[in-house]
């Protein structure tokens, strides 16, 4: 039995996916997806000739229960391949999908992760920061006081543990995030801003907090990942 996780975001660039992935995807007719509409659009980008109406999609969101997932996996248990597609990243890596894989593993079903772009890995690669030890924290608190406290805590971990710290923000709050980082971190602390990774207009730049002052591009409408190191 095989369960294939696409390990690619449905809104990311098709050029970054190996041709092997296409072969696998075209052999799958059951998909567990974060968003049905964008998953259908993604599959059409993979192959324009694909007959979407012959495919079955199962929604994966915060309302999906373990019982739902077990039901979704019935085709897999019957010997068919299934795929997991998340919105903009790698399924099960800082993205939905881990619960599906956990249940598949419990049922002794084969899980095959496919190679694809991960903004976490690619941003570490492009930052010049420690790639041996790094931690991804997702979204930081929205409340200003809590956010400032969290940023300072992450900066302390950089110096105490020599560990790269990564986090993200909703695009329309990106500019405010950079502002908060520059206000709360030491001048010598390094900040890498990685935006639009693998897509047109890709931007990956590392500078000290002091060097970033007054020189930050507008990040308000693009996906970004922020990295701190020393």
Task: Pin down the residues of each PLM region.
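Short glycine-rich anion-binding loops that position phosphate/pyrophosphate groups of nucleotides
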Residues: 10-11, 87-91, 171-172
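Class I SAM-dependent methyltransferase SAM-binding "motif I" and its flanking Rossmann-like core
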Residues: 95, 99-157
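Conserved helicase motor
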Residues: 58-65, 140-144
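Single conserved hydrophobic/aromatic residue that forms the stacking wall/gate
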Residues: 1-14
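Glycine/small-residue-rich loop that forms an oxyanion/phosphate-binding "nest" at active or ligand-binding sites
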Residues: 61-64, 68-111
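A contiguous loop/helix-start segment that scaffolds small-molecule binding in enzyme catalytic cores
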Residues: 5, 80-81, 159-230
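General beta-strand structural signal in soluble alpha/beta enzymes
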Residues: 33, 86, 111-116, 167, ...
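A short beta-strand/loop micro-motif in the catalytic core of glycosyltransferases
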Residues: 29-35
């Amino acid at each position: 039995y095989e369960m294939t996780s696409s390990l690619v975001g449905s809104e990311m660039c098709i050029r970054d996916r190996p041709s092997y992935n296409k072969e696998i995807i075209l052999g799958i007719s059951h998909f567990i997806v974060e968003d049905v509409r964008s998953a259908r659009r993604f599959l059409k980008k993979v192959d324009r000739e694909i007959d979407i109406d012959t495919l079955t999609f199962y929604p994966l969101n915060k309302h999906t229960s373990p019982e739902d997932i077990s039901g979704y996996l019935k085709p897999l248990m019957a010997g068919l391949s299934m795929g997991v597609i998340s919105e903009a990243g790698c399924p099960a890596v800082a993205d939905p999908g881990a619960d599906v894989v956990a249940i598949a593993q419990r049922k002794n079903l084969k899980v095959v992760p496919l190679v694809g772009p991960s903004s976490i890995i690619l941003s570490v690669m492009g930052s010049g920061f420690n790639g041996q030890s790094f931690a991804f924290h997702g979204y930081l608190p929205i409340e200003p006081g809590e956010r400032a406290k969290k940023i300072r805590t992450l900066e302390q971990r950089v110096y105490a543990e020599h560990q790269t710290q990564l986090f993200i923000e909703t695009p329309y709050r990106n500019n405010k995030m950079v502002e908060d980082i520059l206000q709360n971190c030491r001048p010598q602390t390094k900040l890498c801003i990685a935006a639009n990774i693998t897509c047109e207009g890709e931007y990956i730049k590392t500078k000290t907090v002091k060097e970033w002052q007054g020189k930050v591009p507008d990040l308000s409408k693009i996906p970004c990942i922020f990295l701190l190191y020393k």
